[in-house]
A protein has these predicted regions:
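Sec-dependent bacterial lipoprotein signal peptides
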Residues: 1-27
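Terminal connector regions
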Residues: 31-34, 102-144
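Short, surface-exposed binding/anchoring microloops in extracellular/periplasmic proteins
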Residues: 41-86
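A short, structured loop/turn motif at beta-sheet edges
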Residues: 65-68, 89-90, 130-133
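Intrinsically disordered, low-complexity Pro/Gly/Ser/Thr-rich segments with frequent PxxP/GP/PP motifs
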Residues: 79-115
Length: 144
């Protein structure tokens, strides 16, 4: 075996080990058991109520400035990720972790954080779905 052939084998082996190490360290951000239903696009409306949403790193803060309470609803983020919320009273503020929002495949939104290698996903649209076939209620997203 020539020196050149031996060098190629060593380089190929090092590359293979590198690929395996990188793949083994990658964290999968999905949980099939947490898979939800797809976003119901036919229920989307361009109407918003006076409920503000503020992003704070890996969480969102929702401030209900209305006199109306909302109970037992689904909160949608970016027309993809959803979390069920027990209630939001008039004047109430709630903080929710973005890591608790899942999509139809069980994937979680990339909320960011110190150890993340990718930039966090922006939160652009937040909506309340009061019931299974009820139209969406848009919230006011305050940009970061």
């Amino acid at each position: 075996m020539s020196v050149e052939a031996a060098r190629r084998i060593v380089v190929a082996g090092v590359c293979a080990v590198g690929v395996i190490v990188v793949a083994a360290c990658a964290r999968v951000r999905y949980d099939p058991a947490r898979a939800t239903r797809p976003y119901p696009h036919h229920l989307h409306r361009a109407v918003a109520v006076d409920i503000q949403v503020f992003r704070d790193s890996e969480t969102i803060e929702i401030v209900n400035s209305t006199a109306r309470s909302y109970s037992d609803f689904d909160l949608w983020v970016n027309q993809r990720y959803v979390q069920h919320i027990a209630g939001l009273a008039p004047g109430q503020t709630i903080r929710l972790s973005l890591w608790d929002f899942y999509d139809e495949r069980g994937e979680v939104i990339n909320a960011g954080g110190f150890w993340r290698t990718e930039p966090p996903a922006p939160v652009r649209l937040v909506e309340i779905q009061p019931g299974p076939e009820q139209p969406m209620i848009g919230l006011i997203m305050i940009r970061e």
